[in-house]
């Protein structure tokens, strides 16, 4: 029986095992999918070594906080993973680890399903980790007009700007400045656990007076404090979660097998 994992920390609240259990049952696939808690980089390395040696583990999803850290442990990447240095899916093939970024595809489906046109839009992105890099690349490729990054980590923020600023001359990318008036902006939250800690609420206070067009929270597990903000529309990450999983399924089984699944039914049952 084929085995698949999702690894990260914390991992107990992940809905991925329930999602894939339903998928495998629906498609009559004999496979198991389970969550594995990885507490540190040393454990991550051990897990990857186990994957290389195992005859049963076919692939795994990678979640916070290891989407970037895993990149040094695998053998090759897809193009999006190379650009973003963010990997959320691996496939084991002949003892080699292949890395993929399916979050990009998931976000692309999210904006399509919710009829969002990012061309010429102004956007504030919260966070500067692997997920933020993925979303920012998507904004750039969709010809967004402005991207302002709001993050506590100035080093990773500066690196994003350095890496991406030359990709599209139509897109301006910069550090958020609370002395500037932001009007007609979207807000995209790419932080891992929402804005619940005191340090993260300090970030929220910097945008409290902005009237947002659309708020997109790519999380699907956490209830954030965005209801206290002003916005016309809010979208959470269930669509992105499901479609990145569909992409993982297609990669692992080397086919468009996800086309057989009823997305709306899955969203109703799992999310």
Q: What name fits each language-model region?
A:
Residues 144-164:
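NAD(P)-binding Rossmann-fold cofactor-contacting core
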Residues 211-259, 263-265:
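Rossmann-fold NAD(P)-binding glycine/threonine-rich loop
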């Amino acid at each position: 029986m084929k085995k698949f994992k999702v690894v990260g920390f914390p991992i107990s609240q992940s809905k991925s095992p329930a999602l894939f259990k339903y998928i495998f049952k629906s498609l009559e696939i004999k496979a198991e999918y389970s969550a594995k808690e990885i507490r540190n980089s040393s454990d991550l390395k051990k897990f990857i070594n186990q994957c290389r040696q195992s005859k049963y583990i076919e692939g795994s999803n990678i979640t916070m906080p290891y989407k970037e850290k895993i990149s040094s442990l695998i053998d090759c990447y897809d193009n999006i993973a190379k650009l973003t240095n963010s990997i959320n899916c691996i496939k084991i093939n002949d003892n080699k680890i292949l890395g993929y970024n399916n979050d990009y595809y998931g976000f692309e489906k999210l904006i399509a399903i919710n009829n969002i046109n990012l061309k010429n839009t102004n956007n504030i992105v919260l966070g500067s980790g692997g997920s933020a890099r993925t979303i920012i690349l998507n904004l750039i490729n969709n010809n967004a007009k402005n991207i302002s990054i709001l993050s506590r980590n100035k080093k990773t923020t500066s690196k994003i700007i350095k890496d991406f600023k030359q990709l599209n001359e139509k897109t301006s990318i910069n550090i958020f400045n609370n002395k500037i008036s932001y009007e007609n902006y979207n807000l995209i939250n790419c932080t891992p656990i929402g804005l619940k800690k005191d340090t993260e609420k300090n970030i929220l206070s910097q945008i409290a007076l902005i009237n947002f067009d659309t708020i997109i929270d790519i999380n699907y597990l956490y209830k954030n404090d965005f209801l206290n903000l002003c916005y016309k529309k809010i979208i959470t990450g269930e669509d992105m979660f499901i479609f990145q999983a569909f992409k993982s399924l297609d990669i692992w089984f080397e086919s468009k097998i996800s086309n057989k699944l009823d997305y709306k039914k899955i969203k109703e049952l799992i999310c």
